[in-house]
A protein has these predicted regions:
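Active-site core segments that coordinate phosphate-bearing ligands/cofactors
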Residues: 1-10, 15-21, 32-50, 71-241, ...
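A conserved helix-loop-beta module that forms one wall/lid of the active-site cleft
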Residues: 48-64
């Protein structure tokens, strides 16, 4: 720490390089450093730690201008002197913005893990349940992340297998297998249990039925996740927008829509770069 000039995230480093001055961060990245996003300040308990507080950045809302683009970059890219540099956000928040989700709607990311976020009027923080909130404008993204997800499918199936078994599934007839798919022991949300073991038995002889059972299990975890968020004070989603590799599976979306009794759609846009561009456009107007 004696040789450090700033405490920063990767996004903060890029921000500093672009505007020629370091020492700024956005509220979404700063949350990971312990920033109090409700009171919008660094908490008092940081004073009890052996941390030079002058290293901590000045925190601003995501999308807020922090300065002009530095002259070397303006010259290199042929941009005007009026070009502003805006505070960024985390990749997951940018992906949420990219979907165009509205207040009360949720985004489920079906990647290697299962990540849920719902846009709410009030924040929810329940670390014992793996639940946290990111500030986004005058609203909040309340969410949690399960260890379940596509990583489990990859342990058993190739892309060709998934395509073939999806066509063979009979989603009108649930398997009743009651799986809790995990890639390894341990879960964090909606059940916070480091000792929770995967439940993938019994395994039927029919691989398509086994595949369907795993999808049903992940869908059930998603359902319980939104129930957990609602029990803690978040709204029940009016719609679930899906991102990640599992978003394109229409049969899975239908299964999840029936279980949650709300529309489940695939996101038209989900790239973090697109969401960041939308954030910048809003912040610069």
């Amino acid at each position: 720490c004696n040789q450090a000039g700033h405490c920063l995230h990767q996004a903060d480093w890029l921000l500093g390089r672009l505007c020629g001055q370091f020492g700024f961060s956005d509220e979404n990245n700063a949350l990971k450093l312990g920033y109090d996003v409700i009171q919008r300040c660094w908490p008092d308990w940081l004073h009890t730690l052996d941390i030079p507080l002058h290293l901590l950045p000045e925190v601003v809302p995501a999308g807020q201008p922090v300065g002009a683009l530095a002259e070397p970059w303006r010259d290199r890219w042929g941009l005007s002197r009026d070009t502003q540099v805006l505070a960024g956000t985390t990749d997951s928040t940018a992906s949420f913005i990219a979907t165009g989700a509205r207040p009360g709607e949720a985004v489920t990311s079906l990647g290697s893990t299962l990540v849920l976020k719902v846009m709410a009027e009030q924040p929810v923080f329940a670390p014992q349940d793996g639940v946290y909130s990111h500030r986004l404008g005058d609203r909040w993204l309340v969410g949690g992340a399960s260890n379940s997800g596509g990583a489990v499918l990859r342990q058993y199936f190739t892309d060709d297998d998934i395509e073939r078994h999806t066509a063979q599934m009979d989603i009108a007839t649930p398997t009743g297998l009651d799986y809790y798919p995990l890639p390894a022991t341990g879960e964090r949300f909606p059940v916070n249990d480091p000792g929770l073991a995967p439940r993938l038995q019994p395994r039927p002889d029919d691989d398509a039925r086994f595949f369907q059972g795993i999808l049903e299990g992940i869908a059930a975890i998603e359902h319980e996740g939104y129930r957990k968020l609602a029990a803690l004070g978040a709204p029940w989603p009016t719609r679930i927008i899906t991102t990640g590799g599992g978003a394109s599976n229409e049969s899975w979306r239908t299964m999840r829509a029936r279980l949650n009794d709300i529309p489940v759609t695939a996101a038209a846009h989900q790239d973090a770069a697109y969401g960041t561009a939308l954030l910048a456009r809003k912040g610069s107007t």
